[in-house]
């Protein structure tokens, strides 16, 4: 069973459609055929009885009663509607006249039939029927074919009984008219054969039409399956929303799922990129410290605190970015804590001095101790670390830091004496992967990360010209009131 199911189940939609419609066509064809056969049979019986009764009336008209005997004179030019055998009885059931003397037929007429008008049938065999058809060569040929197929086949003859009351010229008579051609040799017996042929032809014609209908009807599903394969092969990003009404909801939900998955993938990829970038500074400090140890410019006792601090910084950054990845896009600030700005910047300056020790960068800071940052400490460190690292990288020697605070905003200014940022590129440097100077190493990530974080605080970063001759970065943090509720 499992092997069968594996090879044949589940059936495709096209096969299901074809089987279902073919079954419906078959059932309807059988039902219509049976109804037609029943209707034909009833109609055939009524028509046969009417014809036989007409011939009975004809024989009654042609009959003459003389000397207590009955005689029937048939005109030579009389055209009988169908070959029949007529028998005339008196009111006691005595046979008075018959067209031909066929003993088995006379014995087959039941006495009770003669008591009322009615329609009856006589069951006989092929040989007996042959005696009735002795003068009908066409019917004899058909009967011969039946005998060749089945020598024991039963034949059915229709019998009409009509009673005529006594008149002044004629006593009461009962006329029995027997149809000499059996029902099996009439066209009615071919109805079943025709029905089988019509049913077979119907299926042979309908199935190809159903296949075409199924192919046309299921084209949207085939198109959807093809688009899904293209998605798997990375040849498209979304499903085509222009589809049939029945599939619109499915396609819309799938596209929404694809969009959500892509956004989640991009979020984690961006977070991983940001984490990698944020680890550059502590790793550079560790590298510089190890180099100093190797060159014996620093003792182990002095290097150990520096290295432990940077390792702790790396651990904090990893935890920070994992948390940030889960909160990205939620619009919720991680904290409303108050942090003095000067100590945070002192730690960053100390780390950057180690990174750019060979370059001899001179970083100065003029910030009042009262100035504080409201929010997540790691957010502030990440933003200012990227901005200061960018300034140290492009300066010639000097970097200056200043700040001012209003009721709801914190402004921090970072200026350097480097080449500055051209006006045409000042908006581009905050986009991921965009850099004003492509000759120096970098990925164009730091300022983009800084801008994203400041935007979470309803802030911004503004690039302009510095009095030192280089670039001036104004970092603005909003939502700086300690009691302000998060939006």
Curated annotation (Swiss-Prot):
Catalytic activity: ATP + protein L-histidine = ADP + protein N-phospho-L-histidine
Residues modified to Phosphohistidine: 277
Pfam families the UniProt entry points to: HATPase_c, PhoQ_Sensor
EC number: 2.7.13.3, 3.1.3.-
Keyword Transmembrane: yes
Listed GO CC annotations: plasma membrane
Residues in HAMP domain copies: 215-266
Cross-referenced CDD domains: HATPase_PhoQ-like
Topological domains, Periplasmic: 38-193
Domain Histidine kinase: 274-481
Transmembrane portions of the chain: 17-37, 194-214
Alphabetized PANTHER family for the sequence: SENSOR HISTIDINE KINASE YKOH, SENSOR PROTEIN PHOQ
Protein's name in the database: Virulence sensor histidine kinase PhoQ
Organism (species): Salmonella typhi
């Amino acid at each position: 069973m499992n092997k069968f199911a594996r090879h044949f189940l589940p059936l495709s939609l096209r096969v299901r459609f074809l089987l279902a419609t073919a079954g419906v066509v078959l059932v309807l064809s059988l039902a219509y055929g049976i109804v037609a056969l029943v209707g034909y049979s009833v109609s055939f019986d009524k028509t046969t009885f009417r014809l036989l009764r007409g011939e009975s009336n004809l024989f009654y008209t042609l009959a003459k009663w003389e000397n207590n005997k009955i005689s029937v004179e048939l005109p030579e030019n009389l055209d009988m509607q169908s070959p029949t055998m007529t028998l005339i009885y008196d009111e006691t059931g005595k046979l008075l006249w018959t067209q031909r003397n066929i003993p088995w037929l006379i014995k087959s007429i039941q006495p009770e039939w003669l008591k009322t008008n009615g329609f009856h049938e006589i069951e006989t065999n092929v040989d007996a029927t042959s005696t009735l058809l002795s003068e009908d060569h066409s019917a004899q040929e058909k009967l011969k074919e039946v005998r060749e197929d089945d020598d024991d086949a039963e034949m059915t003859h229709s019998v009409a009984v009509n009673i005529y009351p006594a008149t002044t010229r004629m006593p009461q008579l009962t006329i029995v008219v027997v149809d000499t051609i059996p029902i099996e040799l009439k066209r009615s017996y071919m109805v079943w054969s025709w029905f089988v042929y019509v049913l077979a032809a119907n299926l042979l014609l309908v199935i190809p039409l159903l296949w075409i209908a199924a192919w046309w009807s299921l084209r949207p599903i085939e198109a959807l399956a093809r688009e899904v394969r293209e998605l798997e092969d990375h040849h498209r990003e979304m499903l085509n929303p222009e589809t049939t009404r029945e599939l619109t909801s499915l396609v819309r939900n799938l596209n929404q799922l694809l969009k959500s998955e892509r956004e989640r993938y991009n979020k984690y990829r961006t977070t991983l990129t940001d984490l990698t970038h944020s680890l550059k500074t502590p790793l550079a400090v560790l590298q510089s410290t190890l180099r100093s140890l190797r060159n014996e410019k620093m003792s182990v006792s002095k290097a150990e605190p520096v290295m432990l601090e940077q390792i702790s910084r790396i651990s904090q950054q990893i935890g920070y970015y994992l948390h940030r990845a889960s909160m990205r896009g939620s619009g919720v600030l991680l904290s409303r804590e108050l942090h003095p700005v000067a100590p945070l910047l002192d730690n960053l300056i100390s780390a950057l001095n180690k990174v750019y020790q060979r370059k001899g960068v001179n970083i100065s800071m003029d910030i009042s101790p009262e100035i504080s940052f409201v929010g997540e400490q790691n957010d502030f460190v990440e933003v200012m670390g990227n901005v200061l690292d960018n300034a140290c990288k492009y300066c010639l020697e000097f970097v200056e830091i200043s700040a001012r605070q209003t009721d709801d905003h914190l402004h921090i200014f970072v200026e350097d004496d480097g080449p500055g940022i051209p006006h045409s590129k000042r908006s581009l440097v905050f986009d991921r992967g965009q850099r004003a100077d492509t000759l120096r190493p970098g990925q164009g990530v730091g300022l983009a990360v800084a801008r994203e974080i400041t935007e979470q605080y309803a802030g911004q970063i503004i690039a302009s010209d510095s009095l030192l001759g280089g670039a001036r970065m104004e970092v603005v943090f909003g939502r700086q009131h300690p009691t302000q509720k998060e939006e």
